Design a protein with these regions (language model features):
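N-terminal beta1-alpha1 ligand-phosphate binding loop
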Residues: 2-24, 185-186
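An anion/phosphate-binding loop that grips the pyrophosphate of nucleotide cofactors and donors
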Residues: 38
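Proline-centered loop/turn at the N-terminus of a beta-strand
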Residues: 74-76, 142, 177
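Pocket-forming structural segment of enzyme catalytic cores
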Residues: 88-165
């Protein structure tokens, strides 16, 4: 079964509905014990980096999430669930992220380009070729974003997705069993839902 991690904040229901619309059964769980028995794990999230890592820690989910990722089973991070995979964020000085990936999260500096923060709405994404999670999705497809901070990764072996908002930024990272995106697949129409379908196929193969 695919589990969606409930840590008290985030876009859980919209992610759950996204999977359901594709006929994919998932469970939303706040029990760390459910993580180990999952075939796939989804970490969604909207909100603040510091609140997220504190909630995960207080609910004893940090260790099980790291163990799950290390097991090689499919993992999907969405929005804030993408950012917390990194080491730190300017949004929460002194708070450590999960540290799965090297790198940090920084605030958009786009005022001089007359752009608003948060970056909100549809934007094009360029993606690496031949990754299973993005199978069937053309280059420069549109995806839906809502975020004020963006990732600056230090992960040389990973495939990186790119978008542009007053300059190029990282819209996602794919590395082995782990796929994580700044945009919201569940809100990104057909191509976003295709990501959820591709993820479920990977889970079935597991």
């Amino acid at each position: 079964v695919i589990s969606i991690v409930d840590y008290g904040m985030g876009n859980l229901r919209s992610v759950e509905k996204g999977f359901a619309s594709q006929g994919i059964e998932v469970r939303v769980t706040e029990d760390p014990g459910d993580i180990e028995g999952s075939s796939g794990l989804v970490l969604p999230g909207v909100g603040a980096f510091g609140d997220c890592v504190r909630n995960l820690r207080e609910r004893s989910m940090t260790g099980p999430i790291k163990d799950f990722i290390a097991s090689g089973r499919p993992f999907l991070g969405i929005c804030l669930g993408f950012q917390v995979l990194f080491e730190s964020s300017e949004e929460a000085p002194g708070e450590e992220g999960l540290g799965i990936f090297g790198g940090k999260v920084v605030r958009f500096c786009v005022a001089e380009k007359k752009l608003k923060v948060p970056h909100m709405g549809w934007n094009r994404v360029s993606a690496p070729e031949q990754t299973r999670i993005l199978e069937g999705i053309p280059q420069q497809s549109w995806f839906y974003f809502v975020h004020s901070y963006h990732v600056v990764s230090d992960e040389p072996g990973a495939d990186v997705l790119l978008s542009d908002y007053g300059g190029e930024f990282e819209a996602g990272v794919i590395s082995g069993n782990l796929s994580a995106f700044q945009f919201h697949p569940e809100k990104s129409s057909d191509y976003g839902l295709m990501i959820l379908r591709n993820f479920s196929k990977l889970c079935l193969e597991n």
